[in-house]
Amino acid sequence: MWAAKLIVVTLLLLQFAALALSCSCGEEAKLECGCTKHH
């Protein structure tokens, strides 16, 4: 089922994108989202 696999990959990408966008790059957030940028 390529369709089911495509849906799973899409959901994972959306989740990753949402996590990256919600990352504030703070001291605590850096540990949670893997942010490496510094203010």
Curated annotation (Swiss-Prot):
Tissue: In bundles of maturing sperm of larval, pupal and adult males.
Protein name per UniProt: Gonadal protein gdl-ORF39
Species: Drosophila melanogaster
